[in-house]
Amino acid sequence: MKQIVKKLVESLPVVSDYYAYHWLFPRRVNAFRGLYSSFDEALKAVPSQTLTGYNHAELHDAPVRLNCTQADMETLNPIDYPVLVWLHKAFEDSSIVCDLGGNTGNSYYAFRRYIPYPENVQWTICDLPEAVKSGEAMRQRTHCPGLSFTTDLATVENAEIFLTCGTIQYMNASLPDFLGHLKNRPRHLIVQRVAFYEGEEYFTLQNIYGVYVPYKIMNDANFVASLAALGYELVDRWSIDRPCVIPFHPDRFVKGQ
């Protein structure tokens, strides 16, 4: 009976949206709701009793809390295979990496099973304090040459490779604006797991394990053009089958990331 009711609800657009907005969103990880014109507006829409932002230990300390081994950390997410291709190529002439939002070192550990790192690699993860704290704890327990952690965005100034996997959509500032203010820009940019579509940029809210965070959906063409204006050339792109569905706003649907 429950399945019949569920199918009926999902088949009626308005009812389905109401169900997704009020019932599914608080209960489902990575669910979305709301349409906002700015980061601050989205932030104000978070209920007062709900955690917001990404700087919470429970979002970053799983590897330490679960006593993960080095082998556990080296598990590759299949959606990151395209990153391996271009990081390997970037390592031909570069060895200094700034991994923005690299959490506890997920990419550093996973990628090295598949591609050789330069002997002089410097891989700096720039993230929030709680992520850095957990990352440092893991670093003490593993063999990880060249890996370091920081909360200082100035690290990007020295980077030759700028890597970010699923982070810039949580930032208020745009990546092109941020890079545009640097005196020394990275030679290579690798941007992964970011939601783009053809419409006007907007913010929504995402549920991440009970924490509500503003989430930016960017205009594809504008993003590419802004980076091109800084001298960067788009050499490849790929899509991940992870849609963003915003209840009551079918025109803001994002097919993949």
Predicted regions and their residues:
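Membrane-proximal basic amphipathic "stem/tether" segments
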Residues: 1-46
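Class I SAM-dependent methyltransferase Rossmann-like catalytic core
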Residues: 40-93
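A short, conserved alpha-helix within the catalytic core of class I
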Residues: 170-185
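Conserved beta-strand signature within the Rossmann-like core of class I S-adenosyl-L-methionine
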Residues: 186-203
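Short alpha-helix
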Residues: 213-239
